[in-house]
């Protein structure tokens, strides 16, 4: 398959998108219905009028053409995409979003579409400054795919430079909310002796360790003694939920001084209170399995994801120097779960 094909939908006997494309597909493409379905799922088939990726549920009545793109094309081209990303603040220098979960910040090999950058290209075209590479226009920091919450995008070169410096010099205050399995304040006898864990004033639990990529599973990060990068997280318990049968959850706020990959998730596991829904950094304990079963009905059928939300950000404005404070509203899945847990709250 070459990089780009335009298919005119002249035959309209089939209305479902995959069948309609198959019926109108030129023989030289040699596309099966299964392959077409895969392309749709990978967001590689578009409406040329709206420049939106199509889905199997797309209404085809008024659809006249579709465009098929290859992997090679998408890897070299940032495609605009109109997505629902709530804006918290915007001026001439920067824009702050409340990123949904299940959204990658910038295109990677496994996610070419549906990223925040695809939306930035749709909204700003090519006006944003290039920061680290051309696939990250305006991006000065990032969040994991399944982490929701506040993310800042620079709109000018001056703003990008200032914000990147603030992140590197640790001048930006970042506070997350996480729903964790267990209560770290009840584990102090077990965890305080571990390397890098200390109890500070006001019941703040600090994890100060080096972190590096796991040599066996490259998707994971791990605490290490040497050769890693310093990561500092401070946990404060905000609420405790007693589910019975030795099952507890805690809502914790976590202020991070550094911004390492998976930092909070790694440190939550280190203090033996992994984040609910985090399958990468879970502990293999019976109580963790039991908690997962107990809260499953409280999710209202929603997909379980790591309950981690970038809740607060405080920065110095790149132009005025004025301190700006932002708070990101909890998404429905997180707030609804907390609401359903309310009857179990003990503190």
Q: What do these predicted regions represent?
A:
Residues 2-347:
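RNA pseudouridine synthases
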């Amino acid at each position: 398959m070459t990089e780009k094909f335009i298919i005119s939908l002249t035959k309209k006997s089939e209305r479902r998108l995959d069948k309609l494309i198959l019926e109108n597909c030129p023989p030289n493409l040699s596309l099966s219905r299964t392959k077409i379905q895969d392309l749709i799922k990978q967001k590689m088939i578009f409406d040329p009028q709206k420049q939106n990726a199509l889905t199997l549920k797309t209404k085809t009545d008024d659809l006249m053409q579709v465009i098929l793109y290859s992997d090679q094309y998408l890897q070299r081209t940032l495609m605009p995409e109109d997505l629902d990303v709530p804006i918290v603040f915007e001026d001439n220098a920067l824009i702050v979003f409340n990123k949904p979960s299940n959204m990658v910040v910038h295109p990677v090999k496994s996610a070419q579409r549906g990223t925040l950058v695809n939306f930035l290209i749709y909204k700003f075209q090519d006006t944003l400054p290039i920061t680290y590479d051309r696939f990250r226009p305006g991006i000065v920091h990032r969040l994991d795919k399944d982490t929701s919450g506040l993310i800042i995008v620079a709109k000018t070169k001056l703003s990008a430079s200032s914000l990147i410096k603030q992140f590197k010099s640790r001048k930006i205050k970042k506070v997350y909310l996480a729903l964790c399995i267990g209560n770290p304040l009840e584990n102090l006898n077990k965890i305080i002796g571990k390397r890098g864990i200390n109890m500070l004033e006001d019941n703040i639990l600090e994890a100060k360790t080096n972190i590096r990529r796991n040599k066996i599973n490259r998707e994971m990060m791990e605490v290490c003694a040497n050769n890693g990068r310093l990561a500092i997280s401070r946990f404060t318990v905000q609420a405790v939920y007693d589910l019975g049968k030795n099952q507890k959850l805690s809502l914790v706020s976590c202020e991070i001084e550094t911004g390492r990959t998976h930092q909070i998730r790694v440190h939550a596991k280190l203090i033996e209170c992994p984040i609910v829904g985090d399958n990468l950094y879970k502990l293999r304990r019976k109580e963790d399995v039991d908690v997962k079963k107990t809260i499953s009905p409280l999710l209202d059928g929603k997909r379980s994801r790591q309950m981690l939300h970038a809740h607060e950000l405080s920065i110095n404005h790149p132009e005025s120097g004025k301190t700006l404070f932002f708070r990101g509203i909890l998404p429905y899945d997180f707030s609804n779960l907390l609401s359903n847990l309310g009857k179990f709250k003990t503190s």
